[in-house]
């Protein structure tokens, strides 16, 4: 039986995996940086956890969380098939929603 989980990065800065059957990408950034793969590139300006799914030629769904609960915005640049789009994830909420996952549909 083939394992659908592919480990793409596993170091002190970035951990990244992909479910090849579902085409879901999961990336943990322990600091600001860029994850690059031939199919996907993601750059962030702060530590965060994100998932990219439902990728097609026109859009992708991005889910992003701030486990550090910094209440600061996180800048994200997503690049797929030479198309790129930038967004700012707002993490200004406090209390039980501090750092909670945000969902964005990214138009490419």
Feature-to-residue mapping (PLM):
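Terminal accessory/anchoring regions of large secretory-pathway or extracellular enzymes
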Residues: 1-108
């Amino acid at each position: 039986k083939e394992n659908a989980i592919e480990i793409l990065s596993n170091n002190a800065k970035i951990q990244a995996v992909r479910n090849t059957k579902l085409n879901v990408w999961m990336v943990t950034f322990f600091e600001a940086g860029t994850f690059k793969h031939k199919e996907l590139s993601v750059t962030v300006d702060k530590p965060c956890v994100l998932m990219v799914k439902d990728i097609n030629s026109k859009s992708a769904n991005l889910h992003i969380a701030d486990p550090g609960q910094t209440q600061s915005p996180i800048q994200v640049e997503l690049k797929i098939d030479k198309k790129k789009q930038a967004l700012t994830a707002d993490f200004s909420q406090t209390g039980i929603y501090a750092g909670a996952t945000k969902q964005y549909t990214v138009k490419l």
